[in-house]
Structure formats: structure tokens, C-alpha cells
């Protein structure tokens, strides 16, 4: 079984999309094995997105991600990373496939409702960033 991190971003929380995201995860057969709502500080957002520190969007991304509450979840399932990334859709919602979360709900590239890990190593780092082993209800 593979694990991945999901974040419902501040725009998704503000717009009341948590339930819709969870519904789609469960419909896809991805098991939620940890979940909590947090409000990241700017420093936490900068640490989480440190890999993008030199990118031109780093400042706006970390400001946005610390602008309101988010819901972080650990998902588990066969090929969980690929399945969740497919469910999310392309980062740029205009390029996302019909029926994906981002195509259906995003309003701009940064306010694209959800985040998901892109690889097993990334998932391990991201899950550990928000959860300790006692908070994860896996097998």
C-alpha cells in the first residue's frame, strides 16, 4: 500500500469544498488514515515549500498557504500517489481534465483547491511534516 499527502488549500476550505474533496477521495477508493485542520504559519509554509524557495512564485505561494486554514490528510491505497494526482488534475486548472477537482473548482493556478505529493520520497517528507506516527491510523 502506498501513502500520499493531500492538502485542501485555503481557497477550498473557505469555499466549503472539504466534503466534496473527501467524497471524491472515497469514491476513488483512497482510504483517509489521518486528517486534521491547521492554520500554517508563514514559517511552516516556507519550510513545507522549501524546495521552491528560488522559484518566482515562492513568496505568493507561501503567503497564500498561510492565509487561512487548510485540511491535511494522509491517503492510503494501491498507487495512491498517481491515483490522487489524476483525481486532482493538472496544476494549471485550464489544462486539467474534465471531472478533476482542479478543473471543476479552481479559480486560478495558485488557488487550485488541493495539493498532492508527486513521488514516494516527497510523500514521506510531506506526511512527516504534518503528522507523527501516532496520528496515522494505518495498518
Swiss-Prot record:
SUPFAM superfamilies hit by this protein: Nucleoside diphosphate kinase, NDK
InterPro entries cross-referenced by the UniProt entry: NDK-like_dom, NDK-like_dom_sf, Nucleoside_diP_kinase, Nucleoside_diP_kinase_AS
Cystine connections: none
Catalytic residue positions: 115 (pros-phosphohistidine intermediate)
Complexes and interactors: Homotetramer.
Family: Belongs to the NDK family.
UniProt-listed NCBIfam families: PRK00668.1
Protein name stated in the entry: Nucleoside diphosphate kinase
Native source species: Desulfosudis oleivorans (strain DSM 6200 / JCM 39069 / Hxd3) (Desulfococcus oleovorans)
Amino acid at each position: 500500500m502506498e501513502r500520499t499527502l493531500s492538502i485542501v488549500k485555503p481557497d477550498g476550505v473557505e469555499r466549503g469544498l472539504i466534503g466534496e474533496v473527501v467524497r471524491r477521495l472515497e469514491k476513488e477508493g483512497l482510504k483517509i488514515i489521518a486528517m486534521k485542520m491547521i492554520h500554517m504559519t508563514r514559517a511552516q509554509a516556507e519550510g513545507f515549500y522549501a524546495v521552491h524557495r528560488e522559484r518566482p512564485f515562492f513568496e505568493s505561494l507561501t503567503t497564500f498557504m498561510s492565509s487561512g486554514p487548510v485540511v491535511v490528510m494522509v491517503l492510503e491505497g494501491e498507487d495512491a500517489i498517481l491515483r490522487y494526482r489524476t483525481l486532482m488534475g493538472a496544476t494549471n486548472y485550464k489544462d486539467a481534465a474534465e471531472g478533476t477537482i482542479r478543473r471543476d473548482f479552481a479559480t486560478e493556478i495558485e488557488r487550485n483547491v488541493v495539493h498532492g505529493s508527486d513521488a514516494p520520497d516527497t510523500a514521506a517528507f510531506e506526511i512527516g511534516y504534518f503528522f507523527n506516527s501516532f496520528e496515522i491510523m494505518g495498518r
